[in-house]
Amino acid sequence: MSSIETYMQSVGEQARTASRAMMRATGAAKNQALLAMAEAILAQRAELQAANAKDVAAARANGLEAALLDRLTLSDRSIALMAEGLRQIAALPDPVGSITATSVRPNGMRVAQMRVPLGVIGIIYESRPNVTIDAAALCLKSGNATILRGGSEALHSNVALGRIVQAGLQAAGLPTAAVQVIDTTDRAAVGKLVTMTEHVDVIVPRGGKGLISRLAQEARVPLIKHLDGNCHVYVDAAADLAKAHDIAFNAKTYRYGVCGAMETLLVHADVAQRLLPVLGQALHEHGVELRGCARALQWLPEGKPADDADWATEYLGPVLAVRVVDTIDEAMDHIARWGSGHTDAIVTENLSAAQRFQREVDSSSVYVNLPTCFADGFEYGLGAEIGISTNRLHARGPVGLEGLTTLKWVLNGEGQVRG
């Protein structure tokens, strides 16, 4: 067994032991740990920024692009936001131990389901050290142990944050091994983490398509994941065009790099001539490159011809594919063929069309008269999220505290026997 395998085996064993203690942890103890972490992050800002400066300097020397450097940097504001996020998670209801679906059987036996932690969660992520705090806090609050493996470019930052997290756990009388940060940049650690089925119950990858595709191929531990956010807005024949304009513009331009950004606009032929010239001009003036089908280009003079690659692409940038369709069926067929199952929306004043779209479009979130950029756990009232899942099993859509738990059946009786 290599040194990395030995190290990861030890981490996994400690996490499994800690997970049993976390199942018993009280809500008060978990909140105490979270609030202690929030205070320590602010009190140790200088130390955190000194560690972060090492990562930023190395990343700059290695030519990391400006956008990724910005994500990597722990500014005063980002540190304050991490502390505030910890306080917000502490204020959320504790899902562990809640009872649902209670019923009484004819023989008087009481049947219910209890929400319990998943166990040990591995989180694999890139660039952003704030994920260390977000992930640790959500896993802690939901009663799980977690193993965190951040990007190599953020190693010093993540290790420093990990020390703060473990000090908070210790102050609350909780096992420090409930949150462990992998302190090696060796990629073999990731390969080992995603195959440790005896110690890890689920993996949550947060990163680019390349990372998630690799993990999906290598993992023996189940993944909560999404590969792409190829999101659509369909403007129906019965749409309010003022609403449609604002929804489509917001869905594309709110933030280009989020997984809920609209990447393809589908417009019914009956309204294309009235909507596309005005909307296309607004998007063009905002710096968005338009790529359309032949029919759409009639009303998009600045547009370029689209091909199949455009329908399949999550641009994560100022590019939008546009297609004119003749029916809602054609729109839904397009989404079924090219979509990623993330978030899709219809703009319509026709109730039956809205209901049909929500029923038949097989995505983790389906909206009526809303932009796709609302795909976010905070906007859903979850308080915070670990990521967005397009899986069909277990969690689907934004994954908050409840998505990091599962259900077990609990039955109570008075001595009944089965005849």
UniProtKB/Swiss-Prot annotation:
GO terms for molecular function: glutamate-5-semialdehyde dehydrogenase activity; NADP binding. Gene3D superfamilies: Aldehyde Dehydrogenase, Chain A, domain 1, Aldehyde Dehydrogenase, Chain A, domain 2. One of its GO terms (biological process) is L-proline biosynthetic process. It catalyses: L-glutamate 5-semialdehyde + phosphate + NADP(+) = L-glutamyl 5-phosphate + NADPH + H(+). Pathway: Amino-acid biosynthesis; L-proline biosynthesis; L-glutamate 5-semialdehyde from L-glutamate: step 2/2. It is an enzyme of class 1 (oxidoreductase). Keywords: Amino-acid biosynthesis, Cytoplasm, NADP, Oxidoreductase, Proline biosynthesis. The keyword Cytoplasm applies. Pfam families: Aldedh. Its EC number is 1.2.1.41. GO terms for cellular component: cytoplasm. Its main location: cytoplasm. It is found in: Cytoplasm. It comes from the Bacteria. Belongs to the gamma-glutamyl phosphate reductase family. Catalyzes the NADPH-dependent reduction of L-glutamate 5-phosphate into L-glutamate 5-semialdehyde and phosphate. The product spontaneously undergoes cyclization to form 1-pyrroline-5-carboxylate. This is Gamma-glutamyl phosphate reductase. It comes from Bordetella bronchiseptica (strain ATCC BAA-588 / NCTC 13252 / RB50) (Alcaligenes bronchisepticus). The lineage of its organism: Bacteria, Pseudomonadati, Pseudomonadota, Betaproteobacteria, Burkholderiales. The gene is proA.
